[in-house]
Curated annotation (Swiss-Prot):
Localization, UniProt: Cytoplasm, Cytoskeleton
Gene of this entry: TUBB7
Binding site for Mg(2+): E69
InterPro entries hit by this protein: Beta-tubulin_BS (IPR013838), Beta_tubulin (IPR002453), Tub_FtsZ_C (IPR008280), Tubulin (IPR000217), Tubulin/FtsZ-like_C (IPR037103), Tubulin/FtsZ_2-layer-sand-dom (IPR018316), Tubulin/FtsZ_GTPase_sf (IPR036525), Tubulin_C (IPR023123)
Pfam families per the UniProt record, alphabetical: Tubulin, Tubulin_C
Cofactor (UniProt): Mg(2+)
One MF annotation (Gene Ontology) recorded for this entry: metal ion binding
Anything else known: There are nine genes coding for beta-tubulin.
Organism of origin: Arabidopsis thaliana (Mouse-ear cress)
Gene Ontology terms describing biological process: microtubule-based process
Alphabetic keyword roster: Cytoplasm, Cytoskeleton, GTP-binding, Magnesium, Metal-binding, Microtubule, Nucleotide-binding
Biased composition, class Acidic residues, residue ranges: 429-449
Protein name listed in UniProt: Tubulin beta-7 chain
Length: 449
């Protein structure tokens, strides 16, 4: 069985993560004590992807929960599904990282990391054939960003050939809870570019907009935002957990989506998103799903795909539908909007179909796109970073934990390189082949070292 090991870190990661487990528990018919109460053998057929089987038929999530302060974990533990997790898999410190990346990455986090790795190792050894890891964290705080990236780099060392997928919540343009977010995010991206295989980019502001505009919620809570994220997370992996006509796994996803190794930051979207009131007035059809899924307002990060071009994209449809219709609709989108796709990657949109829809829906779809417009997010964070770094504002919090200014400069230039790489491929046309072949050769050389 192709298992996935789920890791959640920091306040944001633990809140998204616990919401995700609520969704997956529902889909697999597992109740709050870990007993199976479902009604279809399909729910159990590949339940091992996310669960270990314990004695007397209990299912236990293959999840590691970490944080540098006990608060969030206590609330996970006292929440509706708190008793389903294995108690040993809660790893927490007492000090907190105080929104400081250096504390999470170098001091406080470094003290806790070995006990986290012990739990990860234990879970990985129990796996039949571990496919990869999925990490939930935010990039604005201290623990999820600093300690999260530390863990990712340690796992990279120990399991170099396993997939590493992250769900990373970026700081939002207008909503900010700490002033040092640009520092933390830039230092994290510096790590993610090198050590992660695929990053699903999320941000609170885009999620707020979806709740507000599309779902018509007047005062969206973090619970509502996290519910959106968890729907997407469950959609990304549904092919692994349920039988389908066109299956995919984390590696196939990466192969189809990543044309150049550093460009692995994806926009995600989900359909159908309808307000509660108007649900019964709509009939879900494949064309409608497709239309909503490609809609710029549906993207869960604050970058507008219309400002760039898609290098590649992947769509996962769930429910009983005709694959032929899915393919026709996807082709239709590409033909009508051909200027938004790079022409030097033919057939760059892949679709997969999984027979089992999410709980409470007839059909649904998840969208993952590798668009050059994601540079807007990096550019925005980079501008904020530069504004503060130029004056060395707040730097003493980081240098006090033993960091060097050099590291900031490196992270800044790595992020700016990433932006210009996206820009370069956005402007590229199919007839400049010569230049690209040379560059690809350089890339391959870098890869082999």
């Amino acid at each position: 069985m192709r298992e996935i090991l789920h890791i959640q870190g920091g306040q944001c990661g633990n809140q998204i993560g616990s919401k995700f487990w609520e969704v997956v528990n529902l889909e697999h018919g597992i109740d709050q004590t870990g007993r199976y109460v479902g009604d279809s053998e399909l729910q159990l057929e590949r339940v091992n992807v996310y669960y270990n089987e314990a004695s007397c038929g209990r299912y236990v999530p293959r999840a590691v929960l970490m944080d540098l302060e006990p608060g969030t974990m206590d609330s996970v533990r006292s929440g509706p599904y708190g008793q389903i997790f294995r108690p040993d898999n809660f790893v927490f410190g007492q000090s907190g990282a105080g929104n400081n990346w250096a504390k999470g990455h170098y001091t406080e986090g470094a003290e806790l990391i070995d006990s986290v790795l012990d739990v990860v190792r234990k879970e990985a050894e129990n796996c039949d054939c571990l496919q990869g890891f999925q990490v939930c964290h935010s990039l604005g705080g201290g623990t999820g960003s600093g300690m999260g990236t530390l863990l990712i780099s340690k796992i990279r060392e120990e399991y170099p050939d396993r997939m590493m997928m992250t769900f990373s919540v970026f700081p939002s343009p207008k909503v900010s809870d700490t002033v040092v977010e640009p520092y933390n995010a830039t230092l994290s991206v510096h790590q993610l570019v090198e050590n992660a295989d695929e990053c699903m980019v999320l941000d609170n502001e885009a999620l707020y907009d979806i709740c507000f505009r599309t779902l018509k919620l007047s005062t969206p809570s973090f619970g509502d935002l996290n519910h959106l994220i968890s729907a997407t997370m469950s959609g990304v992996t549904c092919c692994l957990r349920f039988p389908g006509q066109l299956n995919s796994d984390l590696r196939k996803l990466a192969v189809n989506l990543i044309p150049f190794p550093r460009l692995h930051f994806f926009m995600v979207g989900f359909a159908p998103l309808t307000s509660r009131g108007s649900q019964q007035y709509r009939n879900l059809t494949v064309p409608e799903l497709t239309q909503q899924m490609w809609d710029a307002k549906n993207m869960m990060c604050a970058a507008d795909p219309r400002h760039g071009r898609y290098l590649t994209a992947s769509a996962m449809f769930r429910g009983k539908m005709s694959t032929k219709e899915v393919d026709e609709q996807m082709l239709n989108v590409q033909n009508k909007n051909s200027s938004y796709f790079v022409e030097w990657i033919p057939n760059n949109v892949k679709s997969t179909v999984c027979d089992i829809p999410p709980t409470g829906l007839k059909m649904a779809s998840t969208f993952i796109g590798n668009s050059t417009s994601i540079q807007e997010m990096f550019r925005r964070v980079s501008e904020q970073f530069t504004a503060m770094f130029r004056r060395k504002a707040f730097l003493h919090w980081y240098t006090g934990e033993g960091m060097d200014e050099m590291e900031f400069t490196e992270a800044e230039s790595n992020m700016n390189d990433l932006v210009s790489e996206y820009q370069q491929y956005q402007d590229a046309t199919a007839d400049e082949e010569g230049e690209y072949e040379e560059e690809e050769a350089e890339y391959e050389q870098e890869e082999t070292y």
